[in-house]
C-alpha cells in the first residue's frame, strides 16, 4: 500500500474510488453528492458509509461517503470513519483511490496524514491461520490524500507505526507452542540484523549468575528455557536511553495456582508487553530519530510441574530483596522486578514497563484505557499527553503508601500480592515500584487493551502508537 499527497480537486481524480466525508452540519461541497445523500437518507453518523456508483461530475468509478458525526469533527470520529471506509474498499476491490482532506479540531495537517496512513494500514491487518502465513495484502495499492502540503513525513510515520503494530499483533496472535521465549529471542535477533541494532540474549545460566531468582522462579516449571532479551537503537551518541521493558510470559497457566480452564487459551496474549516493545523498536528503527532506545524482554512460560514454584515459597530477587510467592499466578511482576533491576546497567533517562499484568485493571478500566502508574509526575504527564495525540488512551492510578503496605509479609521483604482482593492493579504497581529506585519509571497495565475476545479475537497492537508518540515527543523536547 503506497500513500501519496496531491493538491487536486477530488472530482478530477481518475481511479477506482474517491472517499469524501459528511457530518451533521455540512456535506461534501458538490450538488450531486448532496442530492444523493438526501435521497438515500444518509444520517452522517460515525461508522456509517454510503457507496455511490458513477456519480455525475466525478471521474472515479465510485464515490464513498463516510459519516463524521456532529461538528466540530473529532479525531475519534475520523478514525471510525476511516475504519468503515476500509471495509467498503476491500469489498469493492478498489486498488487506486483518493481521500478528501479533512480538518480535525486540535490537530495539524501532518497529524491527519499520520493518522490516516496508520489507521488505513492497520485496518487491513488480518488474523491468519497457523501454517498459512502470507504477506498481508488488502488489494489496495495506492491511496492519494488531498493536501496542500509537500511533506510526506506524516505518511511515513503513520505507515511505520502501522508496521510496528502489525508485528505486535502477529506475535500476539501466534499460538504459544510457536511463540516461545526462544521465538521472541529469534524475532529480536532478526530485527537487529534487519536494522543494524545491538542485540543480547541472556540464557538461564546467565540469569542464575546475576541472581535473578524471582524471574527463574516463574520459568522453573516449564520445559521452555527462559530468555532475557535486550535490543538497542543508538540514534544520539552517548545520551541516556529511554528503556522499555515488556512482559513476555508466552503462556500463563497460572502455575500451581492454576487458572480456570475457560478462556485459558487467551493466556498466549500474556506476552503482548514484549510484543509491543518489539513493535516500537521496529517503528523507531524505520523513523530513525535522534534518540537512544533500549527494549528489554524478560521471556518465560508459566507452567505447573513437580518442580514449579509453590504458594508460600520465598525467593531472592536480583535486587537482593526477598519475595514470598503467595500466588504463582501473579507471575508477571516476578519477572519484571528482576528486569527492572537489570536495566540500571543502561543508565536510563526513563524506564517504562508494559505488561498484561492484572485482571483488576480490566474491571476498573475495561478495554478502552490502559492503566498508568508512575513515580514521576512529569513522566506521567508526558505519557498522558502522548496518549491524547496518538488516541491510545491511558488512565492514571495512584501509588500511595496505604496500598504499598498491603504487600507486607511475615516471611520475606514483601509478598507478591496484596493481603486482600482490593486494588489489585495498584498493589501490583506498588510491587514494581519497589525495584525502580534511582530512575524515573512508569508502568502501563495493558491487560484490557492488548487484545480483544469474542468473534473478532486478536491482538490490537496497543500501545505501540502511544509509546512511539511519547518517544517522538521526547525528541522534540531535546531540540
From Swiss-Prot:
Kindly list the cofactors needed.
Mn(2+)
Q: Which HAMAP family match?
A: Cytosol_peptidase_M17
Q: Where in the cell is it found?
A: Cytoplasm
The cysteines joined by S-S bonds are: none
Give the E.C. number(s).
Answer: 3.4.11.1, 3.4.11.10
Q: What does this protein do?
A: Presumably involved in the processing and regular turnover of intracellular proteins. Catalyzes the removal of unsubstituted N-terminal amino acids from various peptides.
Q: Which residues does the Swiss-Prot or TrEMBL record annotate as the active site?
A: 259, 333
Query: What's the top EC group for this one?
Result: hydrolase
- Bound cofactor: record note: Binds 2 manganese ions per subunit.
* Alphabetically ordered keywords of this record: Aminopeptidase, Cytoplasm, Hydrolase, Manganese, Metal-binding, Protease
GO BP of this protein: proteolysis
**Name under which the protein is recorded:** Probable cytosol aminopeptidase
